[in-house]
Amino acid sequence: TKPYFDDQFGREIKWDLPLLGGYAHKSLKNFSPSPSSEFWGQINPGVIKEIVRNKPDLLLVYGWNSLTNWLAFVTAFCFGVPVVLHGENPLNQELLKNRIRLAIKRLILTPLFGCVSAFLYIGEENRKFYEYYGVPHKKLFLSPYAVENDRLIGAIDKPREGRGELRRRLGINEDGVVILFVGKLIDKKRPMDLLMAYENLKDSNKVLVFVGDGILKTALEKYVDERDVKNVHFVGFQNQTELPKFYAAADIFVLPSGVGETWGLVVNEAMCFSLPVIVSNMVGCGKSLVHHGQNGFIFELGNVEELTGFLDNLMADKNKLNSFGRESFKIVQRFSYKEDINGLLQALDYINNKNHL
């Protein structure tokens, strides 16, 4: 994959793990004058030719927020190719939209969903989203959002050995309780909520580590300097092979994101390292990965006082920290690529059985 400039990170990004190896692939030319993840940012008419020429047994489409996806839908429907739709929209965020927008969206999605053969949902809120728009239960198959559990878990021994080394490099003593944030420092992620909650903590052993870059970094650093908040570390963007060191050196993981955080794969990653996790009630993975009071806590979006209380609760009890971490590790085992494949295979079986009736 080629390096690219990420506006939200505010820097050029080149992932240090291969993303295109191990499978056949073909990239279609994008004719959009302004390529992006927006609707008009993906215009790949070549998808029509590919579907017509190959007439696949099944077409797997991720979302409906681009012209290319709609070209794929229409072509597949016209040529009798079954479509499996994979989306990520959580219902709790959907219901925050105004009634007029929801009504218009229902007019668009109802006929589209009626033509789709099967649906893959990533978690509980996403399943509820599909049901809200009238998708019958029999067409829904769980294909949870997952990360490379095996690679991350396999990296644990080596990073654990370097846990003390990384802490020493950052000036963190062995008794320090490290609270970790991983992600872009942007409005959607709400890192300031975490910084304010951290400031309120009374434990003198508290440490906060921000992994990532973004437009809010300057404001966060200014807040730390002006209010003399102790033991806050900004380590910048860390690539995929470096991240395990930071998860291994941490004690608690927090993702305080707001609307737009449809899942939060960094939570999966943190749980692979047996970390207790705290997320806001708008983080899409919350109801699937965070079992409140068992492996972490879910706080009301923007409620800094509640977040502070949950952090205090964990930091005051070392045994709870450890038991929550063990529970996180157990839970994330059910969110793996194997489960993704099982969901797709179940959808295929459903389509084949339906076609043979």
PLM feature segments, named:
Residues 218-238:
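Nucleotide-activated donor-binding/catalytic signature segment of Leloir-type glycosyltransferases, i.e.
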Residues 237-238, 245-250:
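Short alpha-helical donor nucleotide-sugar binding micro-motif in glycosyltransferases
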Residues 168, 306, 313, 320-334, ...:
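A short, well-ordered alpha-helix in the C-terminal region of glycosyltransferases
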Residues 109-164, 234:
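Donor nucleotide-sugar binding/catalytic pocket of nucleotide-sugar-dependent glycosyltransferases
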Residues 276-280, 290:
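Short hydrophobic beta-strand element within catalytic cores of glycosyltransferases
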Residues 248-262, 275:
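Acidic donor-binding loop of glycosyltransferase active sites
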Residues 173-189, 195-198, 209:
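Conserved donor-binding/catalytic core segment of Leloir-type glycosyltransferases
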Residues 82-86, 90-115:
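Nucleotide-sugar donor phosphate/pyrophosphate-binding loop at the beta->alpha transition
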